Amino acid sequence: MQELRFVLIIVGALAIAALLFHGLWTSKKEGKSKFGDKPLRKMKVESDDPPSRAFAAEDDFEIIRKERKEPDFGIPNQQHDPLISDFAAHDELDEEEDEEARIPVQPQSQPQPRKVQPQVEMPRVAPNVPMAKVQPEVVTEIEVQEPQEEKLDVIVLNVHCAGNQPFIGTKLFDSMQQNGLLFGEMDIFHRHADLSGTGKVLFSVANMMQPGTLMHDDPADFSTKGISFFMTLPCFGDPEQNFKLMLKTAQQIADDLGGHVLDDARNLMTPNRLDAYRKQIQEFKVRAAQA
């Protein structure tokens, strides 16, 4: 730090000397130019001559007395010369710097390192925003009314053997085929609207005994005590005509095998029971028309 001050003092002194030299040189140059530009006038009258000296009338000119002013080579007024004022200011600064240089420089105490407290980031707490109460959505259950399945009516007729001798498969299956019944789905026989077996089913024939099927490998080995005829309402075509055809087929097979026609309760068929079947069919037709 002290060496830097010495360097600044030396540089300041050189700058002041340069400014002084420049100022003196400029002043001399201005003085010479003023003296050289002045016109030559007549010589100064001797100082011992009286000022009221008369001249002859014949003189064609008058000697003009004028005091000659010697050129001033002195230093101009410092107040009007900016260079000199600057030099004075620099001199004052140099004197102050010299005085500061004489003052012993006390060693500066090293600043004690401050203990830096580690910054602990505080957890950001989310603003307490009141939560809107969510009203439970009331779901209105719409009762979908499923279409009610149409109630099926089943009309059943049975053909049972007359005694203890069961129906043998050979004669039974032969008689059934002759009356338009064909073996098909669910291992039972069906009567189709078309005798070729491609039309809609009008009624079907199953085994009266368990398990209800008429499945057989050899007709001669098959035997049963009876078969059941059944038709469902609604059915394909006219239900009354289908019932007449089913009743006629059952009576024909019973005649072929020597059996009896029974109702759904396995009782002998009577005219009153036949009327009850017909009435059941009529009532079904009325309900179907009103639906």
From Swiss-Prot:
UniProt topological domain (Periplasmic) ranges: 1-5
Predominant location category: membrane
GO biological process terms, semicolon-separated: division septum assembly; FtsZ-dependent cytokinesis
Similarity remark: Belongs to the ZipA family.
A cellular-component GO term for this protein: cell division site
Organism superkingdom: Bacteria
The keyword Amino-acid biosynthesis is annotated on this UniProt entry: no
Localization per record: Cell inner membrane
Biased composition (Basic and acidic residues): 29-51
SUPFAM superfamilies on file: Cell-division protein ZipA, C-terminal domain
Entry-linked HAMAP family: ZipA
Residue intervals passing through the bilayer: 6-26
InterPro entries: Cell_div_ZipA, ZipA_FtsZ-bd_C, ZipA_FtsZ-bd_C_sf
NCBIfam families: septum_zipA
Keywords recorded for this protein, A-Z: Cell cycle, Cell division, Cell inner membrane, Cell membrane, Membrane, Transmembrane, Transmembrane helix
Topology in the lipid bilayer: Single-pass type I membrane protein
Protein name, entry field: Cell division protein ZipA
Region (Disordered) residue spans: 29-61, 92-119
Assembly and binders: Interacts with FtsZ via their C-terminal domains.
